[in-house]
């Protein structure tokens, strides 16, 4: 599962099992807002993180997290002739919450807008989050909802934590995730997932 639930790929066959995309018509509008407010903005193709604005340390982090090469493009709105899985704003933590609210006001009726960390603002297809993706996956696999376990640490994990039979917050999770979780495990750096497997499986 990738792109905050926007795409599910069968690990063995490498085939896409499920995918939801956003309309590319929003990219010029999102890019305009990013440039006017000195924010970073990226979207994705099959192999790269496409940088539509200036590079910043948060864009470099995202490229590292998802193991994709960052590619700066001055005319990304012309290059993207397909509907992408998502776009991502990057912003300094001191202003990210403010911009999240403004972007929600501008695009919230057409797109899902939420922070996944203090410096990432996700732009997703309407109705798409990790919970929706898990619902699709377990229906395909025939797994009851009550038998699911979801582990997360960021704002973008909240819906998934609420949906799962057991919602688990990592020790390093934001407070909002810890408040919703049924159980808190160790951090990402201290085998927190292993602890969950040993306890519940």
Predicted regions and their residues:
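Active-site metal-binding loops of divalent metal-dependent hydrolases
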Residues: 5, 152-154
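Asp-based, Mg2+/Mn2+-dependent phosphohydrolase catalytic module
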Residues: 163, 168-201
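Alpha-helical substrate-recognition element adjacent to the catalytic core
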Residues: 1-25
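Conserved active-site and cofactor/substrate-binding residues in soluble primary-metabolism enzymes
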Residues: 25, 129, 188
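Hydrophobic/aromatic beta-strand patches that form the interior of the parallel beta-sheet core
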Residues: 1, 149-151, 168, 185
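Conserved acidic, metal-coordinating active-site core of Asp-based
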Residues: 29, 33, 37-151, 160, ...
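Short, well-ordered alpha-helix to beta-strand connector turns
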Residues: 5, 84-85, 164, 181
